[in-house]
């Protein structure tokens, strides 16, 4: 039996930007009727490679073959003509148009007689393409009435109208519920059966092993290898991605606990927290687990002063404090890293340095009330080095950094204020495995230095691996607390769903 021809073959692809070589002699293969995972840490070059394939960027060197024939991708239009479509993490549907108008946007069907758009034909063809992916939605509905999962189906149907043979999906389940994710997997299976090659980018390992057939790995802008999914496990895949074996994903450090740092008594807020009481010591990481909507983030935001408490007391170092707003919390040494770093944690249009000192500008005021840029720059460079922020310089826009490095910048912003209590909400969401371990090591260092840390996470292995104690919330209340040595996923989930033994 002869060797099968891949649907897609990229050979020797290189791409440079000013000051950085993003891709260096990268190769990639994907087969029709298969789902190929494209893996790598943030900054490995995945997005750049896919932007070259989909016509957003032009390659400096290299060749692209589709079914053995070399093609020249000069732009988005030529990529689509070659049968290549990308479905971005941020969906590009237009909410003010109907489903059929979105599906055929730029490719409308016109009446032979009037020259006007043939709405009836658009609706009929839209229904046909939607049925092909098992989606039963009225094509006349406005896209604004759809949920995220349904909007994603519109993007996939749109790809089919362009005779897509290769569909790239970039972090497709990030904003989906569990039910929507399962529906997407069914659609991917239907596409696969049609002979379409799917390139699937995700940080979620469980998804890779569930739906993918092969994996292609990039590391530091270079090709790091490929494998059949059946031939590798989680540890081998991580080793390919980071270039080293991660024996221990969660480097827990046991340190001596200090005095009581934070005490919360009977705290409530109208956003959903009901009578929460707990303590936190210096040199301790308190993990908070719970299902979505359990009140974890609301509790954090109430302590931080973003939400107004309706009852309860907060004490710091044994003395009651009054927190009515965020500045009250910051002035008392309480800082909060939001679960949504792009919307609430940083300003994407500002530089790394500007984001770092944003909350601490008064420190750099001279007697003329202007900024002492030299002193500011010294502190910025210190933290860039101290917590290993990978950036060309402090002037780089934070939006150009990987998720892990953005998180480090936000952490540095708060560390510059020397907080006593640090609340971190979903600290490694959307961050690759290598950067995760760096964040964990950093939290361990902060704990060892006497900081009191609250870590909210939906990742149970993370909560179990890093925390000294675990507090579980359910429906706005604290449903239980577990010591590190007695906690496991089952005991946490029982408390999370309200089963108290």
Swiss-Prot record:
Q: Where does ATP bind?
A: 40-47
Fetch the Pfam families from UniProt.
Answer: ABC_tran
Matching entries from InterPro entries are given as: AAA+_ATPase, ABC_carbohydrate_import_ATPase, ABC_transporter-like_ATP-bd, ABC_transporter-like_CS, P-loop_NTPase
Which GO cellular component terms, listed alphabetically, does the Swiss-Prot or TrEMBL entry include? plasma membrane
Q: Where in the cell is it found?
A: Cell membrane
Topologically, how does it sit relative to the membrane? Answer: Peripheral membrane protein
Keywords for this entry? ATP-binding, Cell membrane, Membrane, Nucleotide-binding, Repeat, Sugar transport, Translocase, Transport
Residue ranges spanning the membrane: these are none
Could you tell me what this protein is called?
Ribose import ATP-binding protein RbsA
Identify the species of origin.
Answer: Clostridium perfringens (strain 13 / Type A)
Q: Which gene encodes it?
A: rbsA
């Amino acid at each position: 039996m002869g060797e099968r021809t891949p649907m897609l073959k990229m050979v020797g692809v290189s791409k440079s930007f000013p000051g950085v070589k993003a891709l260096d002699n990268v190769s990639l293969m994907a087969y029709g009727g298969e789902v190929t995972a494209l893996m790598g840490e943030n900054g490995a070059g995945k997005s750049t490679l896919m932007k070259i394939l989909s016509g957003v960027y032009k390659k400096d060197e290299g060749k692209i073959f589709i079914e053995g024939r070399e093609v020249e991708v000069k732009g988005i239009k030529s990529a689509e003509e070659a049968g290549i479509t990308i479905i971005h993490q941020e969906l590009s549907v237009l909410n003010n148009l109907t489903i059929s108008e979105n599906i055929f946007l730029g490719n409308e069907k016109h009446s032979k007689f009037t020259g006007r758009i043939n709405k009836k034909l658009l609706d009929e063809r839209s229904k046909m393409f939607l049925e092909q992916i098992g989606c039963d939605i009225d094509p006349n509905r406005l896209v604004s009435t759809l949920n995220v999962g349904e909007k994603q189906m519109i993007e996939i149907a749109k790809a089919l109208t362009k005779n897509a043979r290769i569909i790239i999906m970039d972090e497709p389940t990030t904003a989906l519920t569990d039910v929507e994710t399962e529906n997407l997997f069914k659609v991917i299976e239907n596409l696969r059966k049609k002979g379409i090659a799917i390139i699937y980018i995700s940080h979620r390992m469980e998804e890779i092993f569930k739906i993918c057939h092969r994996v292609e790995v990039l590391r530091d802008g270079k090709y790091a290898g490929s494998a059949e999914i059946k031939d590798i496990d989680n540890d081998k895949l991580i080793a390919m991605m980071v270039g080293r074996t991660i024996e221990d994903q969660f480097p827990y450090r046991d340190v001596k606990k200090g005095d009581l740092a934070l005490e919360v008594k009977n705290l409530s807020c109208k956003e959903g927290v009901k009578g929460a009481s707990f303590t936190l010591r210096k040199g301790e990481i308190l993990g908070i687990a719970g299902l979505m909507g359990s009140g974890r983030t609301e509790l954090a935001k109430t302590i931080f002063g973003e939400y107004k408490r309706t009852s309860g007391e907060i004490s710091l170092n044994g003395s009651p404090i009054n927190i009515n707003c965020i500045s009250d919390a910051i002035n008392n040494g309480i800082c909060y890293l939001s679960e949504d770093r792009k919307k609430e944690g940083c300003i994407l249009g500002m530089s790394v340095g500007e984001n770092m000192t944003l909350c601490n500008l008064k420190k750099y005021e001279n007697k003329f009330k202007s900024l002492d840029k030299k002193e500011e720059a010294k502190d910025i460079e210190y933290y860039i080095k101290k917590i290993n922020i990978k950036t060309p310089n402090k002037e780089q826009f934070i939006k150009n950094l990987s998720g892990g490095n953005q998180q480090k910048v936000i952490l540095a912003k708060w560390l510059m204020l020397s907080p006593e209590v640090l609340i971190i909400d979903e600290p490694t969401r959307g961050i690759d495995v290598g950067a995760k371990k760096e964040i964990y090591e950093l939290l361990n260092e902060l704990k060892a230095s006497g900081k009191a840390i609250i870590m909210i996470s939906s990742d149970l292995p993370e909560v179990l691996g890093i925390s000294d104690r675990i507090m579980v919330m359910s429906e706005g209340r604290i449903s239980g607390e577990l010591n590190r040595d007695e906690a496991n996923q089952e005991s946490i989930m029982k408390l999370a769903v309200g089963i108290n033994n």
